Amino acid sequence: MTPWVPAVRRTVPHLPEVVLSALFVALFLVWSWLVLTGCTAAVDRIRPLFLPPRSYAGQIAEAFSLVTHPLVIVIAIAGVTVFSFRRRMRRLALALTVAAAGIPLQTILALTTHRARPHTAFADSISHFGGAYPASHVTAMTLGAWVLVTLTRAHRRPTSSVAQWVGVGVGAVALTAACQWIMGLAHLSDIVGGLLLGAAVANLALSAGGVDSILSAWARLGLPRESTDKRAAVIFNPAKFDDLSLLRRRVEAEVLAA
């Protein structure tokens, strides 16, 4: 009975992420059923004005679509994952691996549902590949924005800086969604599906890696590894803190940074 109690308590910090992940998965499944049964046909009939591919706006949209291509995003996330693992930030590497896995998962779902893309003048674009549901670029950019915000938080930035990067991430996702819709590469329902899938995988990644573990590991980045003569006095309640190794890493990071 004694070993079982700490195991239960260790899951408590991850509970919000697990709940949010389950919620977004449920919403994604419900929305997918509505889309694939044709219940969102009225929403999908809302179409943007025709955008000539060779116009200035068309070329800018296609260039942005290339930058936010899922292959580009997954390579970027994989690079940060390898960097994190080599720096022994294994919890962060685990979370990033789960996030990166969301992009091939989207590809599998798109091939499985095999939903036709809307008629578009950008049919020859490199972004026009695979099925339409869920929207590939939106899913990838949602995960990419999550990685950006997570790394910003983990790098111990001020609250105002974190808020700014959250705004940048949200803006990038919104711009990606608008670009995909304006180019006629995705229906509105496909975009909503991409957002829900990306949010579900992002919260699953957080629950797998653990917020506190990620923040503690990244906080030590760039700090001296050699021992110092600095000391710290810590007063804590053992009944409320079961992960002593995490406490030690956080205290070491604070001492080395002081």
Please identify what each model-predicted range represents:
Residues 16-23, 90-98, 164-168, 190-193:
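Alpha-helical transmembrane segments of integral membrane proteins
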Residues 28-31, 100-108, 171-181:
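Aromatic-anchored segments of alpha-helical transmembrane domains
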Residues 32-35, 80-86, 178-182:
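Hydrophobic alpha-helical transmembrane segments
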Residues 75-76, 83-159:
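Membrane-interface loops
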Residues 122-222:
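Membrane-embedded catalytic cores of phosphoryl/pyrophosphoryl-handling enzymes
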Residues 213-258:
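ATP/NTP phosphate-donor binding region
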